[in-house]
Each structure stands twice: as structure tokens, then as C-alpha cells.
Swiss-Prot record:
Protein name (Swiss-Prot/TrEMBL): Calumenin-A
Source organism of the structure: Danio rerio (Zebrafish)
GO terms for MF: calcium ion binding
Record GO cellular component, one term: endoplasmic reticulum
Similarity section: Belongs to the CREC family.
Domain EF-hand: 68-103, 104-139, 151-186, 188-223, 229-264, 265-300
Ligand binding (Ca(2+) 6): 278, 280, 282, 284, 289
Pfam families according to UniProt: EF-hand_5, EF-hand_7
Broad class of the protein's primary localization: endoplasmic reticulum
Presence of the UniProt keyword Cell membrane in the record: no
Positions contributing to Ca(2+) 3 binding: 164, 166, 168, 175
Length: 315
């Protein structure tokens, strides 16, 4: 059972840092590409299909006729129209694309859900999570494995409260997803930065200096000479990370490092799909406009929409 995801992540980080001193640990979170294919609508729409449905889902479209594709695309459109006003806006399309690209995250949450939802009420309370994750450890105030579980639990509780949007100490699936994968949510970015700084800031001054920055990536105890990438990272810190040149990174500088403002591929694709399909140029799409351009969205392919719609309903 996957009942201790954060504990396992912590333990793996420790092993990583101590067992492979020459390998670089990367804390930077980048968005995955929408598709591995070229975006060339002059040749085909495969990139758009992958972006709209997710690359794995798009592979299962091959056996559907155009009529079946249009029918099932119509059902998808109803799901995208979040406010049910009969139109699909660029923002709604962007949100759908982002969700399609995060399928692996939702699958991970789904696998863990049943282990924590002890009373089967389709919610996970902090007490449920705490009891499953830390119950046996808290019975021993001084475990011999070197981990401070009370400290780790307090950190998890702080993150849980941040993910719990309505403050009821109970998480629905979207809130629990934000708890397990905070880097994917705008309102959770501050907690990602805070946890990163707590991990790296060894002297407790609230900043990350050069030696702490390098020490987090590289364990030099067993080596005479530093690998070349370490020297490069020292330069990166001085030239780019430490923007105000005070010799350390503050919260804003740390956020720029680990959560860079990457090019928003989902937004660009949403703009592209609206531009190509919006025949009356009112800035939003009707179901008819989307179905008229079904080849752009799904072509003569389509996902196993029965499965897809059930999965998206759950979230």
C-alpha cells in the first residue's frame, strides 16, 4: 500500500544525497511538454490531439469513425464548459488541457485515496491522514532510525491546512491532490518555497547562501575534486540566482529558482484552438464551432471517453 508518500519522498532524498555524491539533485519544477510531436498543423494535428486529450489518451482514438468522434467530442465539450453557459472560453480550455496533462498525478492520487479514506466518505480528514501515516511512529518518542516524525508531522499538517481551501480540516480529491503535489497549484507555491528553504537553510537565518545551495546538490566528503557542474552551479548562483547580489537567496529569489516562470504551453495551445475554431470571432467557442473543427481537436480518433469521463467526474 502507498500509505506514506511524503515519508518515502523524504527518505529517498536522504539516500540520494548520501549515496551518489557526483550526481546533481534538481529542485527545479518544470511543466512537462504537451506532446512529443512537432506542432505543425500544415502536416497534421497530432500535437493538438495530444495537448487536448493527453498523449496516452490520444493513442486510443484510431478505431473511431468521424461520427463517433464528433459524438464523444460533444460530451467532452460539456465537461469543459465549467460554468455551463453554453460556451467554451480560452480559460476553460486552458484548464482542461492542464488537467489532461496531469493525468499521471490524478492516477497517483487515486491509487492512494483508498488507503487514507478510512470511513469511505469520499473525503480525507487530517486525522485520517495522520493516523495512517504517523500512528505507529508517534508511539515511540525516540525512534532509532534518525527521523524526527513529530517535526515531519507538523510540517505535513501545515501543508494540509494550506491545501484545505475551506478550512474544515477535511480534503476532497482536489484538495488532497494539492497536498500531495503542491508544485502543481498556484496557491500552494508559497509552501513549496518554504519547505525548500527549510530543507536547505542549515544555519536557520531564513536565507540560502552559496554553501548551503551547493551543499544541497553535492556531497563532497568522498571526493578530492569537484565535478565541473558544481563550478557551473556556483556561477549560476552568483550571476543569476542571487539577483540582488547580497550573497544569499531570499524567498522571492528561491521561488524564481525552483518555480521558474516557464512558457505556458497550455495557454498557448488554448489560444491556438480558439483562434482556429472561432468562426464568428467573439473570443469563445460554441459546441457547434468545436464539432465543425473536430479534426483539429480529435481527428478521426477519440479517447475511451467512457473511461475518461468517469475519471474526470471523480475530480
Amino acid at each position: 500500500m502507498e500509505i506514506r508518500p511524503l515519508l518515502m519522498c523524504f527518505a529517498l532524498c536522504v539516500v540520494y544525497a548520501t549515496s551518489k555524491p557526483t550526481e546533481k539533485k534538481d529542485r527545479v519544477h518544470h511543466d512537462a511538454p504537451l506532446s512529443s510531436k512537432e506542432h505543425d498543423d500544415g502536416t497534421n494535428f497530432e500535437y493538438d490531439h495530444d495537448a487536448f486529450l493527453g498523449e496516452e489518451e490520444a493513442k486510443t482514438f484510431d478505431d473511431l469513425t468521424p461520427e463517433e468522434s464528433k459524438n464523444r467530442l460533444g460530451k467532452i465539450v460539456e465537461k469543459i464548459d465549467a460554468d455551463e453557459d453554453g460556451f467554451v472560453t480560452e480559460a476553460e480550455l486552458k484548464a482542461w488541457i492542464k488537467k489532461a496533462q496531469k493525468k499521471y498525478i490524478y492516477d497517483n492520487v487515486e491509487r492512494q485515496w483508498k488507503d487514507f479514506d478510512l470511513n469511505n466518505d469520499r473525503m480525507i480528514s487530517w486525522e485520517e491522514y495522520k493516523n495512517v501515516t504517523y500512528g505507529t511512529y508517534l508511539d515511540d518518542p525516540e525512534p532509532d532510525d534518525g527521523y524526527n516524525y513529530k517535526q515531519m508531522m507538523a510540517r505535513d499538517e501545515r501543508r494540509f491546512k494550506m491545501a484545505d481551501g475551506n478550512g474544515d480540516h477535511i480534503a476532497d480529491k482536489e484538495e488532497f491532490t494539492a497536498f500531495l503535489h503542491p508544485e502543481e497549484y498556484e496557491h500552494m507555491k508559497d509552501i513549496v518555497v518554504l519547505e525548500t528553504m527549510e530543507d536547505i537553510d542549515k544555519n536557520g537565518d531564513g536565507f540560502i547562501d552559496l554553501e548551503e545551495y551547493i551543499g544541497d546538490m553535492y556531497n563532497h566528503e568522498d571526493e578530492m575534486d569537484e565535478p565541473e557542474w558544481v563550478a557551473t552551479e556556483r556561477e549560476q548562483f552568483s550571476e543569476f540566482r542571487d539577483k540582488n547580489k547580497d550573497g544569499k537567496m531570499d524567498r522571492e529569489e528561491t521561488m524564481d529558482w525552483i518555480l521558474p516562470a516557464d512558457y505556458d504551453h497550455a495557454e498557448a495551445e488554448a489560444k491556438h484552438l480558439v483562434y482556429e475554431s472561432d468562426t464568428n470571432k467573439d473570443g469563445k467557442l460554441t459546441k457547434e464551432e468545436i464539432l465543425n473543427k473536430y479534426d483539429l481537436f480529435v481527428g478521426s480518433q477519440a479517447t475511451d471517453f467512457g473511461e475518461a469521463l468517469v475519471r474526470h467526474d471523480e475530480f
